[in-house]
Swiss-Prot record:
It comes from Borrelia hermsii (strain HS1 / DAH). Keywords: Ribonucleoprotein, Ribosomal protein, RNA-binding, rRNA-binding, tRNA-binding. GO terms for biological process: translation. It comes from the Bacteria. HAMAP family: Ribosomal_uS13. This is Small ribosomal subunit protein uS13.
């Protein structure tokens, strides 16, 4: 089982798909990595030899920001927005959509489950 960037690649999948199990690598980037290293993207992960795994590991660690470092960079950029109190930072802090979507209705994913107002039905009668 190949281990790259702290992640065990799934053995039975093609390399181009197996690489997407690493956070920060999608299909396009996986194909790009395969092209740089000269490894066939259709090859199964279990068929890789140590030399090919080392090539992949070297390219990924040197050229790309993946896994924990990428997660921390994203968290730091969001924290920076909140610290400078710009519009996007305030929206992050309040848990509302950032990019101009309506919030009177919809926006349920960002706002979370509905918070019901107690006794609203009884008061209206």
């Amino acid at each position: 089982m190949a281990r790259i960037a702290g992640i065990d690649l799934p053995n039975n999948k093609q390399l181009q798909i197996a690489l997407t199990s690493i956070y920060g690598i999608g299909r396009a980037r996986a194909l790009e990595i395969c092209e740089k290293t000269g490894v066939l993207p259709d090859k199964r992960a279990k068929e890789l030899d140590n030399d090919e795994v080392n090539k992949l590991r070297k390219i990924i660690e040197s050229d790309y920001v993946v896994e924990g470092k990428l997660r921390s960079e994203l968290a730091m950029s969001i924290k920076r927005l909140m610290d400078i109190a710009c519009y996007r930072g305030l929206r992050h802090r309040k848990g509302l959509p950032l990019r101009g979507q309506r919030t009177k209705t919809n926006a349920r994913t960002r706002k979370g489950k509905r918070k019901t107002v107690a006794n609203k039905k009884m008061a209206s009668k």
